[in-house]
Amino acid sequence: MSLKVKDLCNIIEDFAPISLKEDFDNVGLMVGDREASVDAIMTALDCTMDVIDEAIEKNCNMIITHHPILFKKPSKITMDTLLGKKIIKIISNNINVYSAHTNLDSVKDGINDAVVNILGFDKSSILAKNNKAVKEAGIGRVVELEQNMTLKELCDRVKESFKIQSLRYCGDEDKKIHSFAVINGSGQDFFEEARKRGVDCIITGDTSYHYVSDYNEMNIAVIDAGHFGTEWPSVVVMSKKLEGALHKMGINTPILVSQNNIDPYKFK
């Protein structure tokens, strides 16, 4: 059986429905031909030029990312801009690009739940429920600890679990953590929801000074593990879901995880 782009779109959307995306978001097939056959799939967090080149080199004509390459409507597509160069190269090499973003964050067993599991916990509740969801879904998860941890212990667990060199945090290292919220990626818009839930700590990425300063004053610890650090699980989630679905269909289309999609930040 030949796998077409439209078949792959249906598989992804069956697991992470487009209806679950946040209103500001853009998800789905970004570039491509729904009737084209899929030879091989590459998964990545971002559709960088390095990822595109890797897909070409490894004969992958389908790239699936978490972050949409077309987040905002471009005013033009030319070789004068980075985005234009990417899209032209994608089209010139007959590559299809699909993105599952906040819908993959929200869905049950999506990125939020994957992050909780990676941290070593198996029970959580939804932080901000998605009212459009037929089943339970929403942004962020709240974990109630059966045994308290100190902030230092939680920071150490985050570093070890996410395999990151360093992180930023606020709060007393000896602070007792009874519950915490996980909001992968840029989670500041949901900090207030976390505060209302009474959590002692928020784990996220991409925090800004004034937000953290305010929540520090409110005695809520914040652990900033970076945008890449908290969202690389998206690649793992998507790859496993696709492998399982294709196996059931008797399709052996190769699925490769990009080796070129790395955190742009370096640390000294």
UniProtKB/Swiss-Prot annotation:
InterPro entries: DUF34/NIF3, DUF34/NIF3_sf. GO terms for molecular function: metal ion binding. Keywords: Metal-binding. SUPFAM superfamilies: NIF3 (NGG1p interacting factor 3)-like (SSF102705). A divalent metal cation 2 binds at H67, H227, E231. Pfam families: DUF34_NIF3. GO terms for cellular component: cytoplasm. The keyword Cell wall biogenesis/degradation does not apply. A divalent metal cation 1 binds at H66, D105, E231. Belongs to the GTP cyclohydrolase I type 2/NIF3 family. Homohexamer. This is GTP cyclohydrolase 1 type 2 homolog. It comes from Clostridium acetobutylicum (strain ATCC 824 / DSM 792 / JCM 1419 / IAM 19013 / LMG 5710 / NBRC 13948 / NRRL B-527 / VKM B-1787 / 2291 / W).
